[in-house]
Amino acid sequence: MKHLFKFSLCALALTMGANTGFAQSGETGLKDAYKDYFSIGVAVNMRNISNPEQIAIIKKDFNSITAENDMKPQPTEPAYGQFNWENADKIANFCRSNGIKLRGHCLMWHAQIGEWMYKDEKGDLVSKEKLFQNMKHHITAIVERYKDVIYAWDVVNEAISDGGWQGGRRGMGEHPSPYRNSPLY
């Protein structure tokens, strides 16, 4: 499904570019060709903003960036109160220095979240109140840190399974239903 969406989006962009002549000229990037209509975004990671060829493409064609994984809960706070801002800061600074909008992705996602968020020191699930307290702690820290550069946040990503996964992830066990397989639900 994700590959189909990406393919469709690329096909749409190429088709629109072909209809206006911009894709063939090599002079006008997508972001400039459609600046009066909508933003053109791309998901990036550290490899993308460290590669000169990819940097050139990003600067030419895109005016909005989404951090692919580097702003998710696990990479930014692997343990309670132990933050690792290195990659997220680099992406934010890249956007600041190049005048590119940044979309935060994402504040909560069951697949990339530290167990500290939903389990106690004995490995038992925490209460709903403690879970909400942990979530608030994490969300407040990251939103405050990037409030000057992030224009929008994806708050919750894939809160429940869409049917493509039936258990087997660390800490989640097996579930007969494709729904309710997140420790956050």
Placement of each model-derived feature along the sequence:
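A short linear-motif detector with a strong N-terminal bias
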Residues: 18, 22, 42-46, 131-133
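Boundary/entry segment of secreted carbohydrate-active catalytic domains
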Residues: 24-64, 68
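Residue-level marker of alpha-helix boundaries and capping positions
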Residues: 81-82
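Generic marker of residues within folded, mature protein domains
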Residues: 10-13, 32, 55, 143
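Bacterial Sec-dependent N-terminal signal peptides
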Residues: 1-26
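Substrate-binding cleft and catalytic face of glycoside hydrolase catalytic domains
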Residues: 27-28, 60-78, 87-185
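A generic structural signal for short, non-catalytic loop/turn and secondary-structure boundary residues
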Residues: 7-9, 33-37, 177
